[in-house]
């Protein structure tokens, strides 16, 4: 039995032990509490360690502030000139990679990543596994392999460095012996002690591979068949700058070589760029190897509380078991349906899911917030965008925190941090794979909420995160909202929970004795309901914050509407952008006006009210249910009263014209579809038919590569930044595909039209993303509606990975009305 399977066996044993004495298997309150606590403990143990530094090509750390962090660096060293630009460490878009990422990855177990480094002419493989045991998150191991690419010389020279840093004051990482003056012939072993991790042992094995040499006299000092270690003592705030620190140490070594031998008699570069062996006391330790041709070595981290050291044989066995388990589970959860049953789509799907999960990171630090609450930020006056610009220019922001966040990311090279509106989309595939992991991430986001109900739309925590963000985009404002996409995830969870729990209430369901951690909160509904009960006060606070800060003005302009309360306007508007909407440069009414109403925000609020009504009902709060139902009813009517244009045949933003009258400004595109995209229309609603006509019109929105963000007929199509002004975005297309499926399967006058569009759009989106991935090795931020080419940010395996769910949806090309499985 693989070691990772012990976790499931332990959980099953625990459940059997707890409840064997109850003949009817009903869960008493005390038993529920014990189960809840134990599931929480086991969840934390299985998720403690991971490659949670997704901005690096490979960097392992625990979900603990100020702890052990590690990282991998490498470069070719066959000449003196290229090294500065050839060292790989942080994921970058401009390094000429021929693709990189996880081909298989499970957050609880591990996986395999391939990095096709065309610039260094080497393919790097990182295999990572977690091995449970003890009380500190278990042990882990990684195998690093390098293989020269086809265009590389057989004697390719590559240097590889692994480092371990200790952030916490009082924690220690010490080398067991100093080797000899030139390095270590065999394995390199560190012993560590940490307040949060206990005792541990870290071994970097000698590994396999040839090593270059030379006839230069320096060979007496720099023996490349030995591993060198350099230990440094640095302030905590500099530890994340490992590459810059390494360059400083290498430069010192180069200066020493030139001083000793002169520039005319310099050794070959593979000896020049070797660190001298200086092991000792430190909080940053570089371990360097230099290889010729292919190579392999292991990194073995053993938790002292596990009672057994991890060995290379364990790593070999666990890699095999993890690969087999992943492939088997993927076939069960995300098996592609027709017409995507070819092997190439399964490989593609595994990569997309793995890179989404492989982008999950742990972030810790302070972020920059402007809590001046300047009156200009109320945006109540005409010309408010100029006033808010002046208020921002006063630079009244301050650092707040520290905070911690466990989250996926949109893109490892360009957006390696948490984005609030992206995260809801990220978690939809992850929820199918591991709902308990999903709930852990949702909880992490809501733990960031302030007392008013605000969560920053972008979490830029710490100096390392800020190093990737221009200063003007670092500041977060407590009156800025973002689409509340996490409610999409909570709705899916609540519906799964309802199906499991049936009509039974808390304490009456049968406990699942075969529960596993990936679905414990669904298999045991009492856990899921308790989770919702604990989260609900934060959800309600956020909903009320939206209503207070993002309200739209109905009464001041004598607008006629079913409800006087339900209208909404994004704050944070400029002339050309509403960044807070997530749709940035999408055309809006001009000039901006405090009387604007935004149909996308109204739709988000309708979806939120719908989800909160379900959750409030689940946790037994009937008065709150009524409140949300009233809000939903008002929003449903006001979408038509305030935003429907009969002449345009779509929903539109509204503003106030020069006569102080309510008027609609229609820019056909994603904005026009939002009531449909979020499922707010009934199957027989005539507005639905008009929207389906718009969506399916090839002269407007429908393209061979997906739904365009803006109509081809718009004067703004493809203009200026062209960010949300023509390109195909997968998150919005996913919402459309889900709703087309829903309307196709529900009897109504538009079901056949919805089915036909579903079949075509599903095929177009999958083929577009797949073809670009096959050609370039990457998923992309957006896709060109004319050519289908991926564009903007590469390795955008955030919401573009929704394609894995799209492939797994039903093929309805044959469907005539019989039941098919529900789609979350």
PLM regions and their residue ranges:
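Terminal accessory carbohydrate-recognition/targeting modules of carbohydrate-active enzymes
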Residues: 2-14, 19-357, 361-365, 742-746, ...
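"… SH3/SAM/PH, and C2H2 zinc fingers" -> "… SH3/SAM/PH, FHA domains, and C2H2 zinc fingers"
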Residues: 12, 16-23, 138, 142-146, ...
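The feature captures the catalytic groove of carbohydrate-active enzymes
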Residues: 279-319, 411-412, 457-537, 543-625, ...
């Amino acid at each position: 039995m693989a070691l990772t399977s012990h976790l499931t066996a332990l959980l099953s044993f625990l459940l059997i032990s707890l409840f064997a004495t109850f003949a009817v298997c009903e869960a008493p309150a005390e038993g529920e509490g014990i189960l809840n606590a134990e599931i929480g403990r086991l969840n934390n143990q299985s998720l403690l360690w991971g490659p949670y530094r997704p901005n690096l090509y490979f960097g392992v750390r625990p979900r603990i502030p100020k702890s052990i962090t590690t990282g991998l660096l490498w470069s070719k060293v066959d000449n003196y000139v290229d090294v500065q630009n050839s060292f790989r460490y942080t994921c970058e878009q401009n390094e000429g990679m021929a693709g990189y990422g996880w081909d298989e990855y499970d957050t609880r177990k591990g996986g395999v990543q391939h990095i096709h480094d065309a610039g260094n002419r080497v393919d790097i493989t990182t295999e990572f596994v977690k091995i449970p045991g003890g009380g500190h998150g278990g042990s882990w191991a990684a195998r690093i392999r390098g293989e020269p690419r086809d265009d590389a010389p057989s004697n390719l020279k590559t240097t590889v460095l692994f480092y371990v840093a200790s952030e916490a004051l009082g924690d220690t990482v010490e080398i067991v012996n100093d080797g000899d003056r030139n390095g270590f012939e065999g394995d390199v072993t560190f012993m560590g002690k940490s307040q949060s991790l206990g005792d541990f042992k870290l071994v970097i094995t000698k590994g396999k591979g040839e090593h270059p040499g030379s006839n230069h006299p320096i060979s007496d000092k720099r023996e490349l068949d030995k591993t060198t270690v350099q230990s440094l003592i640095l302030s905590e705030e500099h530890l994340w700058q490992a590459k810059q620190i390494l360059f400083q140490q290498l430069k010192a070594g180069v200066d020493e070589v030139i001083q000793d031998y002169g520039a005319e008699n310099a050794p070959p570069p593979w000896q020049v760029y070797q660190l001298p062996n200086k092991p000792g006391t430190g909080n940053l330790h570089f371990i360097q190897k230099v290889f010729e041709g292919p190579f392999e070595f292991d990194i073995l981290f053993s938790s002292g509380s596990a009672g057994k050291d991890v060995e290379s044989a364990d790593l070999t066995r666990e890699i095999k078991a993890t690969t087999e388990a992943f492939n088997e589970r993927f076939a069960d959860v995300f098996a592609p349906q027709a017409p995507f049953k070819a092997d190439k789509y399964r490989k593609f799907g595994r990569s997309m899911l793995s890179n989404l999960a492989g982008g999950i990171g742990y972030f810790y630090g302070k972020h920059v917030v402007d809590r001046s609450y300047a009156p200009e930020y109320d945006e109540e006056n005409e010309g408010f965008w100029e006033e808010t610009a002046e208020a921002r220019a006063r630079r009244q922001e301050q650092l707040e925190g520290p905070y911690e966040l466990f989250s996926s990311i949109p893109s490892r090279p360009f957006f390696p941090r948490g984005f609030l509106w992206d995260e809801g989309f990220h978690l939809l595939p992850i929820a199918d794979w591991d709902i308990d992991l999903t709930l852990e991430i949702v909880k992490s986001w809501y733990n960031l909420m302030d007392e008013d109900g605000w969560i920053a739309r972008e979490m830029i925590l710490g100096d390392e995160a800020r190093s990737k963000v221009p200063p003007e985009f670092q500041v977060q404002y407590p009156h800025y909202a973002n689409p509340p996409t996490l409610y999409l995830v909570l709705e899916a969870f609540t519906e799964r929970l309802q199906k499991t729990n049936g009509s039974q209430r808390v304490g009456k369901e049968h406990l699942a004795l075969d529960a596993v951690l990936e679905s414990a909160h669904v298999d045991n509904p009492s856990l899921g309901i308790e989770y919702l009960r604990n989260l609900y006060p934060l959800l309600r606070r956020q909903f009320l914050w939206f209503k207070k800060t993002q309200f739209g003005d109905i009464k001041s302009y004598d607008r006629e509407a079913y409800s006087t309360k339900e209208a909404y306007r994004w704050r944070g508007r400029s002339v050309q952008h509403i960044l807070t909407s997530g749709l940035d440069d999408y055309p809006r009414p001009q000039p901006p006006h405090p009387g604007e109403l935004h149909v996308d925000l109204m739709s988000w609020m309708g979806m939120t009210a719908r989800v909160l009504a379900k959750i409030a009902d689940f946790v037994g709060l009937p008065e709150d249910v009524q409140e949300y139902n009233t809000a939903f009813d008002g929003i449903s009517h006001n979408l038509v009263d305030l935003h429907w244009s009969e002449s345009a045949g779509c929903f539109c933003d509204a503003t106030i014209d020069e006569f102080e009258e309510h008027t609609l400004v229609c820019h056909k595109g994603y904005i026009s579809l939002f009531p449909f995209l979020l499922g707010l229309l009934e199957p027989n609603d005539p507005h639905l038919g008009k929207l389906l006509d718009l969506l399916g019109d090839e002269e407007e929105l429908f393209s061979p590569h997906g739904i365009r963000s803006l109509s081809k007929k718009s004067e703004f199509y493809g203009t200026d930044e062209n960010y949300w002004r023509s390109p195909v975005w997968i998150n919005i297309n996913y919402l459309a595909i889900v709703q087309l499926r829903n309307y196709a399967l529900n009897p109504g006058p538009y079901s056949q039209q919805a089915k036909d569009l579903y079949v075509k759009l599903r095929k177009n989106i999958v083929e577009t993303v797949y073809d670009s991935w096959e050609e370039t090795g990457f998923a992309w931020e957006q896709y060109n509606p004319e050519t289908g080419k991926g564009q903007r940010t590469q390795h955008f395996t955030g919401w573009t990975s929704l394609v894995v769910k799209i492939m797994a949806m039903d093929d309805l090309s044959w469907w005539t009305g019989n039941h098919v499985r529900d789609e979350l």
